[in-house]
Amino acid sequence: MPSTPNFVRSNWSLVRTVGTTTSPFTGKTKTQEFDGVYWTAEVSLPPMRRSQAVEWQSFLLELNGTVNHFKFADPDALTNTGTYSTGHLTSELRTNSSSVTLSFSGSTITAGASTFGSAKVGDFIVVTGATNEDNNGTHKITTVTSATVVVTTSTFTTESNTASCKVRTNVKGATGLSLLASTNAASGTIKKGDYLQIQSAANTTGTPTQLVMVTEDATATADGAKDFYGVAIQPKLRSDLATGHYAVFTNPKGTFRLISNEVSWSADRISNYGISFSCIEVI
């Protein structure tokens, strides 16, 4: 995509697919969230002469309507506000148990095995298999009491000795990530409103699998050679983020395609061109 000129107007949206049913008798509403969550954008370029317009015309035409994809980002948030000092972080599965007995009380989770031995304060864990549905989902760790006990920001329904639960990190559906700084020297903040580019490999140049926004200032823990980061995100993680795969901090982008198969532009009497287009994140 051409780098200049920058857009003069942008409408940036997050679209969720949520089913809603309202009882005609009680008025109570039930909702169900589905996997279809994606960003959309409508953008307009400033008036430009033909020498610049042809770059954008060529780019848009080569997209072949909705067929081809391109990297794109929120035009008004191209640079993150956090001070994290290198280009990316890596995924680290500090908690990854596929079958463990769990008990829930207050804000505490107790495991029947050493599930939390590598967990850090600020990590986000995803629980599945609990009997009480409110106990499942993403939970943020505030205290690692021991290898079997953690305290979280959630309030649980009391439940004891439920077998075959899963406690994992960086899995599909997570609304928080457990990340590791890319080098011993990497440090700094990741701030609310920053974006991260989720990769399906250990590189920064491949096709992004998802673009997410940080929804609270990240928790950074210095413990050993590399800093650990717990990062709350929206939308939820679309697919598992494997160990070592990258979350790109510098110039993060998502993968987008045009919404329409039609490409058009306008020109005035002195040959100033006007170009606008709409795009949608690829799921």
Predicted features and spans:
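Glycine-rich, often proline-containing surface loops adjacent to acidic residues and nearby aromatics
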Residues: 37-42, 170-178
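Oligomerization/assembly interface segments of phage tail-like spikes and tubes
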Residues: 30-51, 265-283
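Small/polar beta-strand repeat architecture
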Residues: 3-12, 81-121, 126-172, 183-188, ...
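A general structural signal for short secondary-structure junctions and capping/turn motifs
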Residues: 4, 31-36, 60-63, 141, ...
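N-terminal ordered "arm"
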Residues: 1-48
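Extended assembly-interface regions of large multimeric machines
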Residues: 41-94
